[in-house]
Amino acid sequence: MSEPIEKPVEKPGVEPVSDVKDTDPAKKDQPVLVSTTKLTKTQSETLKKLIDELPQILEETGDSSYDEIYGYRINKSGLEHVHDEIRNEIVLKFLIAEEYKFEEARTRLINTFKWRKKFQPLSAAYSETFDKELDDLGVITKYDGTNENLHVVTWNLYGNLKSPKKLFQKFGQDDKAEKEGSPFLRWRIGLMERALSLIDFTDKSNSKIAQVHDYNNVSMFRMDPGMKAATKEIIKIFGDNYPELLSTKFFINVPTIMSWVFTFFRTIGLVSEDTWKKFQVLNSGNLATWFGEKNLPKAYNGSNDSTVESLFASEAKTEAPEYAKIMIHKAALDID
């Protein structure tokens, strides 16, 4: 029932930002394009080339007017609503995902623009409403004072899934007459988009989100075929269109008998050491070490004498970015 392990991406040459000033004269004239990652000269040049190529990239999507990713305008500098720093950081994520290979990153960007125009994830996030059965499966929280990139969290509460077969019969089928994808898929993508509105792409400590997958009272041996198909589709979409946005993925209340699966994947090389570092596989629900006791209900070893459902009471308020609102309005006019 978990979203399966994504294909690992190695990130050679990426180092954390350092306070030590670079005194190399050959690097003084290099533009500082991003603040979250220290780039080599070659990496910086490749990023600049990719940014400069954006107008042509947009032309190749078939609709250059759709220039939005995660609610921000991704286009050339000087245009209204283009925030250079945010744009650069988003483009960098696509470049890192392709190991700084220009052509591959360029193709990934083209495909993401196309997918976003077709799927309309902003509508799923901010315009559409979903059945309570779906809304009860996930929630977004935001915590202050937690460790780096553990501030924004999406919770996947599979224990609230009472009847997987019935739910996926009801919400797991595509309804192409209305929107692209099934209601479940649109709900899940919408959850992700809303979570991304809470991060700061230019802040090294808050430029990614964390995910929690809670398997309490869930059988991992009997997964509904509809859920398997939906999970596979979600992983493909996330892998292609949401690169470098996950800091840590917590798998909690995992039955001991299933814990070996994660270790096995690592042993045979399906999970790189870099990707493995993002995983926390726990037999319990104790998350206090990462998110703090005061933020959590008792079920997660928190100090709050409340149930898991109390997370919904502390759900983070999300708002569409400025340019997202413009694109949502434009899409509505196009439909009319």
From Swiss-Prot:
Its main location: cytoplasm. Residues 144-308 form the CRAL-TRIO domain. It is found in: Cytoplasm; Endoplasmic reticulum membrane; Microsome membrane. Non-classical phosphatidylinositol (PtdIns) transfer protein (PITP), which exhibits PtdIns-binding/transfer activity in the absence of detectable PtdCho-binding/transfer activity. Regulates PtdIns(4,5)P2 homeostasis at the plasma membrane. Heme-binding protein that may play a role in organic oxidant-induced stress responses. It holds the Pfam family CRAL_TRIO. It is a peripheral membrane protein. This is Phosphatidylinositol transfer protein SFH5. Heme binds at Y158, R188, H213, Y215, K249. Residues 1-30 have a biased composition (Basic and acidic residues).
